Every structure is written in C-alpha cells, then in structure tokens.
UniProtKB/Swiss-Prot annotation:
Organism this protein belongs to: Shewanella sediminis (strain HAW-EB3)
Enzyme Commission numbers on file: 6.1.1.10
Record: residues binding ATP: K335
Motif ('KMSKS' region): 332-336
Annotated protein name in UniProt: Methionine--tRNA ligase
Gene responsible for this protein: metG
Length: 692
C-alpha cells in the first residue's frame, strides 16, 4: 500500500448524448480508468464519476428528427453508452446524466451565487434567427460561404478549408442548417459571465502546475488578447435548464455540463452514507479532484470552469489533464475508409483488453495525438500480451498441474523476483504521472527477462530427467511467480485478464502482496487466457464501419463519378492545396537518393531575437547533435516543440547565417504563417533512423 491514503475524485469529459461512443472517445475513458484503477490498487480512496452531457440544440433537433421527446432519446443513449463502457471494462463509481435533479439544483445554485456576487451581466445582442423554425441559430447551425477563402458550405464559426474564424453574420449567403431558410437578424437579451473579473486568479492558476505546460502556453493567447465576458444563455426553444428568474432563457450547455461532474458525485453521495459531498468540493477541501479531457475543450475546463467555481465559493480542480486526438492508420477517422470505428463494432469482433493495452502502450502525459495503426496494433498485442505475457504461464503451468499436484515450490533463488519487485516504485511513479507507455515498456522488459529465463532453463527438457524434477519444479514455480507480478503490474490496464489470472492462481493480485511467498500454494488447472489477433477480425471491423456510399451516388446523379485511376487523371478539388501549389517537375530516383532524411528529437528550441520567423533548434540524432534554424516561429512556441520527434534533411550543406550556422532542415507542411505543421513520425521511430 502507498504510504498514506489519499482521497481522490477523478472524472472524464462527459460524452454527448446524441450518438454512439467510438474509438476516439474510448482513448480518454481507458486512460482515466487505468489511472483510477491504479489509485485503488495502491489503496487510495478514489471515485471515478462521469455522466452523459444531455443538453443543447443538437439533442433537441435530433430528437425532433426521430419524432420522440429529448428525454426519451437521452435515456436510450445513456443506456447504450453505459453498456459500451461496461463492455470495455470501464469501471465508473457512478455514471449519471446532466439532465438530472442534482444538476438542475447545483446549476441554479452556482448561477445565483455568481449573480448575487455581481459576476453575471446582461446586454442585448443581435443574432441570426430562423424565421421558419422561430429559433435563434447557434454558430454550427448556420452555413454559407467563407468570407475569407470563398469556400462554400462552411459553418458559422470557422472554415474547414482555410481555418479562418469569424462570426456567423460574416458568412456570405448564410442559410439555416435546420430549415434551409435565409436567416434574419434579431435582438435578444443575453446573460454573460464576467470572466475578466477572474483574470489575475486564472493567470496564476494556469501557471501553477495545475495544467500541462503546453496547455498553459496555449491559454496564454487568451490572456494576451484579453479575456471576454462569456455568453451563458440561450433562447427558447432549447433543451436544457431554464435560468432562474428568466422565463424563456436557458443555460448554455457548457455552463451546466461541467457542473455535471458535481451532479454525478452528489448523486453518488446521496446513495452512500460513507461519502460527503463537501469533503471533495468545499473551498477548504483537502481531497484531490482531477479532470481528464481532450485538448479541444481545455478553454472550458481551464478558464471558464475554475472561474465559475471560484466565484461560487467552491474549490478548483487539483489538475486538468489533456490528451490528443486519435488517428487511425495515420489519418483522421474516416467513415468511407471504415476507420471511424464505433465501440460496439469493435466489441463485436475483438477483445476490449487488446485496445486497452495498445492505448496504454502509446499514452504519455503530453497532448500528442495517438495513432491507432491497425497492423501495429495486431503485432504489438500478439507479441507483448500473447507471445510474452500469457506464454510465460502457458509454457510452465501444465507441468505444475501434471507433475507436482498443482502446488508451487519454495523458490530457492529469489534473484529474479527481487529484480521484478525492485521496479514496483518505478512503475508506480509512471502510472501516477500518466506515463503509461513508459510503464508498459518497463513491464515488457521484465517479461523479456522472465521468458529468457524459462527458455534458458528449458523445463520441458528438465521434466524428462527424473534427477531434475526439483529443478523443473523450481523453474516453473519461479516463472509463475514472475508472471503473477507482471499481471499485478498490468492489472489497471488488463482488469479482465487479472481476474482470470486470480482464478487460475487462486490468489488475489494486489500491490500489497507483490512479494508474497506462495510456497506450497495450490493453483487451478491452466486455461487459455488470451488469443492472438487475426487480421480477419480487423478487416471485419473496417468493413462493418464503412458507409454505404452507393446511396449517396444515386441520390446525386448530376455529380459525375470520378474516373478510374487506371484510365484518367483524378480531378483536383478546388479547395485542395494541390490547386495553389501543384506538384513539382519529376526528378530521378538518383536525385532523391542523395537526400539523407533522418529522425531527430528536438532537444532544445529557442527564439532568435534578431529574426521574426526563425526558431533555433538543437536536433538530437541519437549520438550527434545538429543546429538548425527553422522558419516556423509563426506556428510554434519553442516550449511546444521540445521533446518532439521530427524529420530532418541531415546531409544538407551547412549554411552560415548571421545568427549562426544552420546544419540541416526540418520538414514541415502547410501554406505558411500559423498554418505550418512539422512532420512527426510514428512514436516507434528513434533518433538517427533513416527515413526511406
């Protein structure tokens, strides 16, 4: 057990109640569940709570499309979400809904405290209004032509093509996405939360270590531009909570959504006599509160939410942990390619523990995106879990049952056990700091040691020699003891496997009994614990996830189908980068072969005071360091680059600049200014590797 018991409340971001869970969502819930299970394994009081985010215009409109009431729809979605989570072995202490009595009461209470303290302001604003549906239109429910690049069919807040942000009123030829009608301008009184009043507190809190440095650096832009009052109201019709003393006005979904953390925990406390809500949420609480979220919602959790809590007299979160997005096979999830995979589709074909392990093996405490490479996924699971971990037991357990009455021997040489136990605090620290990938590497390195031990000892040979029965008994018992330690270390990641191993070993796997002496202990007969992934199962997932594009083609016959790549050129999308920056003239392979492209880690990045566009980078090639001046200052802060892997031209002739010598070039994509992205290789790549 850990030195002293901590009181911890941990949350994941609330899934929106208008659709199913997919594998992009699952990253966060798996990450949080692993961390929560680890805390409990260490003996801490840890409560993992969540809820469906059940309010807002999208839910109201989706229910209308289905011809049912929003309450009916969110109840059905809640049931589906809970089943998906349960089948992925996500163990919430409570999963609730923001459309609850507890959340209504807490939202009203917090709002009134903010209002009475002078933090709520009102003013009249003009918004686009759908005259056919008699409703004001949120940003994402207005579409039109981008005022910057003139791309059609863009949302009312930003352009998917050029990345520009703007107001819905800036769109050219705007249309309601609800009815197709041309919206009109209409005035309405709105309620605003006075976020600027908390600027000093937020400036200090965001630099206190409560959030990752990358996030703090990003939020610095908000402070540089000056915090603005936050619109927290929406007009009827709207599915949500009506604002106290304001008929026809509703809380914006992002006001009551984070309060849903409190509402879900209040619901749990009301059902348990041993839990007190104020112990975790009062201003003077000594408990720890952690939020796991995606990097796309950091502004809500790291600015608006702590300010609301501060203004209403509650404690702020201990930390907010953000993670990156999930890509599949190096690209954004795609319905047409079958890589937009729903949790249920995955569960119909593969063991959830496979994905839990793969995500854990690639997760760090940074906000880098995680790529689910499906071939690598199969290879890593088959190699690590089946080939290394489970194989350790399958190669030795049968001998214990058949030759030694199922009983383990007293281990004479405990050298290996001591090596394994010496890693427990290293592994614990990695779990604690959310460095799951590093923890998995430590554990698999131990698995390699154990397998090498068994291979060298060859109990299948020893067992044939009557004079070496004791030695065979020792080897098999030692191997199973090492296997027990490994599975205990992996228990937060692989809870179902751990349950099965506990049944097989007939012994509980806890952190406290890692060093237990199992001499004379009887185990059950070994049964297969895990099967290898067959690529046919992955192919089945992809096929089941593909959209039926035939209907789309038939519904729009006036749109010509693209010609076969074998018979004609593929037309260039007018919004494609190829349109403005065509492919260069062909070069010979010999010309290309002259380039020496290498993986490099950005060891250090710093500003060049004399240059407006350059950053000075120290690139580690795994034994050699090169200095490069890169024109990426408009897109990156130096601190956001340090530690990242990238690709560089390593054999470019050094170029003397007035700031110093540049010894190569890093590769980046994009048109320029803020739209630049350095190339980041798969995390399996190592500094110094050649790109070929």
């Amino acid at each position: 057990m850990a030195n002293s018991q901590r009181k911890i409340l941990v949350t994941s971001a609330l899934p929106y109640a208008n659709g199913p869970i997919h594998l992009g969502h699952m990253l966060e819930y798996i990450q949080t569940d692993i961390w929560s299970r680890f805390q409990k394994l260490r003996g801490h009081e840890c409560h993992y709570i969540c809820a469906d985010d059940a309010h807002g215009t999208p839910i109201m409109l989706k229910a209308q499309q289905l011809g049912i009431e929003p309450e009916e729809m969110i109840a059905q979605v809640n049931k589906e979400h809970q089943q998906d989570f349960a089948d992925f072995n996500i163990k919430f202490d409570n999963f609730h809904s923001t459309h609850s009595v507890e959340n209504r009461e807490l939202s009203g209470e917090i709002y009134l405290k903010l209002r009475d303290a002078g933090f709520i302001k009102t003013r009249t604003i003009s918004q686009l209004f759908d005259p056919e549906k008699s409703m004001f239109l949120p940003d994402r429910f207005v579409k039109g032509t981008c005022p910057k690049c003139k791309s059609e069919d863009q949302y009312g807040d930003n352009c998917d093509n050029c990345g520009a942000t703007y107001n819905p009123t800036d769109l050219i030829d705007p249309k309601s996405a609800v009815s197709g009608a041309t919206p009109v301008m209409k005035d309405s009184e709105h309620f605003f939360f006075d976020l600027p009043a908390f600027e000093n507190m937020l400036s200090e809190w965001t630099r206190s270590g409560a959030i990752q440095d990358e996030i703090a650096n990003k939020l610095a832009e908000w402070f540089e531009q000056g915090l603005q009052q936050w619109d927290i109201s929406r007009d009827a019709p709207y599915f949500g909570f009506e604002i106290p003393d304001a008929p026809g006005k509703y809380f914006y979904v992002w006001l009551d959504a984070p309060i849903g953390y409190m509402g879900s925990f209040k619901n749990l406390c009301d059902r348990r006599e041993d839990l007190n809500f104020d112990d975790f949420w009062s201003k003077d609480s000594t408990a720890e509160v952690y939020h796991f979220i995606g990097k796309d919602i950091v502004n809500f959790h790291s600015l608006f939410w702590p300010a609301m809590l501060e203004g209403a007299g509650y404690r702020k979160p201990t930390s907010v942990f953000a993670h990156g997005y999930v890509t599949v096979n190096g690209a954004k999830m795609s319905k047409s390619k079958g890589t937009f995979i729903k949790a249920r589709t995955y569960l119909d074909n593969l063991d959830p523990e496979y994905l839990r392990y793969y995500y854990a093996a690639k997760l760090s405490n940074r906000i880098d995106d995680l790529d689910l490479n499906l071939e690598d996924f199969a290879q890593r699971v088959n190699s690590d879990l089946v080939g290394k971990l489970v194989n350790l037991a399958s190669r030795t357990a049968g001998f214990i049952s058949k030759r030694f009455d199922g009983k383990l021997a007293k281990i004479a040489d405990t050298t290996l056990e001591e090596t394994f136990l010496a890693k427990q605090e290293v592994i614990a620290d990695l779990y604690e700091n959310r460095e799951f990938g590093k923890a998995m590497r430590e554990i698999m390195a131990l698995a390699d040691i154990a397998n090498a031990y068994v291979a060298d000892a060859a109990p299948w040979q020893l067992i044939k020699d009557e004079a070496k029965q004791d030695e065979a008994h020792q080897v098999c018992s030692n191997a199973l003891n090492l296997f027990r330690i490994l599975v205990t270390y992996l228990k937060p990641v692989l809870p179902k496997l751990a349950d099965d191993v506990e049944a097989f070993l007939q012994f509980p796997l806890t952190w406290d009994n890692l060093g237990a002496d199992l001499a004379g202990h009887e185990i059950a007969k070994f049964k297969a614990l895990m099967q290898r992934i067959d690529m046919k199962n992955i192919e089945a997932i992809i096929e089941a996830s593909k959209d039926n594009l035939q209907a789309t083609t038939e519904a729009a016959p006036e749109k010509k189908a693209k010609k076969s790549a074998e018979t004609a050129d593929v037309a260039v999308d007018t919004r494609s980068p190829l349109e403005s920056d065509p492919i260069s003239d062909e070069i010979s392979f010999d010309d290309f072969a002259k380039l020496d492209l290498r993986i490099a880690r950005i060891a250090k990045a710093e500003h060049v005071p004399e240059a407006n566009k350059l950053l000075k980078l120290q690139l580690d090639l795994g034994g050699e360091t090169k200095q490069v001046f890169a024109g990426i200052k408009s897109a990156y802060a130096p601190e956001d680059l340090e530690g990242k892997l990238t690709v560089m031209v390593a054999n470019l002739a050094p170029r003397k600049m007035r700031f110093g010598m540049s010894e190569g070039m890093v590769l980046a994509a994009g048109p320029g200014n803020k739209d630049l992205w350095i190339l980041e290789p798969h995390e399996g790549a190592q500094p110094g590797m050649r790109v070929k």
